Amino acid sequence: MAKLTKETFIASLKEMNIQEVMELVQAMKDEFGIDPSAVAVAAGPAAEVSEEKTSFNVILKSDGGAKIAVIKAIKEALGLSIMDAKKMVESTPVAIKENLKADEAEELRKSIAASGAEVVVE
């Protein structure tokens, strides 16, 4: 008997209908003693690809019409000069502070948003 190549097997499989494929699978289970539930258990749960975000950026989207109050809030929160805070507010959207922990980012967002600014944490 000639050796069956992978390509020949796949080509033959493509020509089969669903019933024939199911019969082939059952025959393989019987011949090789494969238990499908054992294969699923051996594979285990799929590894989670998503990582939990640990670094956050606080972004000033707009001054919300309260430019002076927002400038003061940024000056106090970041320890900037009044001119640096003004430049930051005038160049929205701008990252106020980057690479913060979640609680620090939320605290900063709340303190600046209290002045009327539109601030988001990303």
UniProtKB/Swiss-Prot annotation:
Gene3D superfamilies registered for this protein in UniProt: 3.30.1390.10, Single helix bin
GO molecular function, one term: structural constituent of ribosome
Statement: the UniProt record of this protein carries the keyword Ribosomal protein: yes
GO CC aspect terms: cytosolic large ribosomal subunit
InterPro entries referenced in this protein's UniProt entry, alphabetically: Ribosomal_bL12 (IPR000206), Ribosomal_bL12_C (IPR013823), Ribosomal_bL12_C/ClpS-like (IPR014719), Ribosomal_bL12_oligo (IPR008932), Ribosomal_bL12_oligo_N_sf (IPR036235)
Keywords: Ribonucleoprotein, Ribosomal protein
The UniProt record lists the keyword Ribonucleoprotein: yes
GO biological process, one term: translation
Similarity annotation: Belongs to the bacterial ribosomal protein bL12 family.
Function: Forms part of the ribosomal stalk which helps the ribosome interact with GTP-bound translation factors. Is thus essential for accurate translation.
Entries under PANTHER family matching the protein: 39S RIBOSOMAL PROTEIN L12, LARGE RIBOSOMAL SUBUNIT PROTEIN BL12M
Subunit structure: Homodimer. Part of the ribosomal stalk of the 50S ribosomal subunit. Forms a multimeric L10(L12)X complex, where L10 forms an elongated spine to which 2 to 4 L12 dimers bind in a sequential fashion. Binds GTP-bound translation factors.
Protein name, as recorded: Large ribosomal subunit protein bL12
Gene that encodes it: rplL
